[in-house]
Design a protein with these regions (language model features):
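Helix-to-loop junction immediately C-terminal to a conserved catalytic motif
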Residues: 41
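ABC ATPase nucleotide-binding domain helical subdomain, centered on the C-loop/LSGGQ "ABC signature"
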Residues: 50-52, 60, 85-125, 168-170
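The feature captures the beta-strand-to-loop junction immediately N-terminal to the Walker
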Residues: 26-28
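Short beta-strand immediately N-terminal to the Walker A/P-loop
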Residues: 23-24, 72
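ABC-family ATPase nucleotide-binding domain "signature/switch" substructure
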Residues: 35, 71, 76, 84-87, ...
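Conserved beta1/A-loop at the N-terminus of ABC ATPase nucleotide-binding domains
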Residues: 1-6, 51
Length: 207
């Protein structure tokens, strides 16, 4: 459970995320989505009970353990004032084939022709030279190429058109090694069927 002074956010909350599973957390504004994300990311500690990671209390782990395995993609993606390539690779040594695969799976590959200098295009300060959708896709490509095993997306495709959102959704849902946690204020019934489990925040939740 978790409470702020004078306000209970979660009580008897029980969620189970298995390796390789695809999960959706759905709730309206004020349902506790942001608080839950901060708990999952280790930014908050539960007042009662615990967040377990590999069956161990998450609080015992070094924060780098999470950052090495987890990627958090939010609506307002942060980019460095450098090239598109550097924002994806973060200076890592990757082959052109690995970069292309990440670009295709993040629906960014076709946009290269729109960039003045392709991958070497300057993204600008915090990516201001790119659209919101392009920034989100760069964040997805970054997570994929760095082999992050847990991907948390907080409305992470909100700036994308339906076609590109579907490309990303398909690649992530079909990747068996990625544990996907999608956070959304709404999910259509036909979309829910694609997920291992859908948790509705604001309701009594159990595993």
């Amino acid at each position: 459970g978790f409470s702020y002074p004078g306000h209970v956010v979660f009580e008897h909350l029980n969620m189970d995320f298995k390796i390789g599973g695809k999960y959706a957390l759905v709730g309206e504004s004020g349902s506790g989505k942001t608080t839950l994300l901060r708990l999952l990311l280790g930014q908050l500690q539960a007042n009662k009970g615990a967040v377990l990671f590999d069956q161990m209390d998450a609080s015992i782990y070094d924060p780098k353990t999470f950052s090495d395995q987890m990627a958090y993609i939010e609506q307002n993606v942060f980019l460095f004032h450098t090239t598109v390539r550097e924002n994806i690779t973060l200076g890592g040594d990757f082959t052109e084939e690995q970069i292309e695969e990440a670009l295709r799976n993040s629906a960014l590959y076709e946009d290269l022709k729109l960039f003045e200098n392709g991958l070497n295009t300057d993204a600008g300060e915090n990516g201001r030279k790119l659209s919101g959708g392009q920034r989100q896709r760069i964040a997805v490509a970054r997570a994929l190429i760095h082999n992050r095993k847990i991907l948390i997306m907080d409305e992470g495709t909100s700036a994308l058109d339906k076609e590109n959102a579907k490309i990303i959704e398909k690649s992530l849902l079909e990747e068996p090694d990625i544990t996907l946690i999608l956070v959304s204020h709404h999910l259509e019934k036909n979309e829910m069927k694609k997920y291992t489990k859908v948790y509705h925040l604001g309701e009594k939740v159990s595993a």
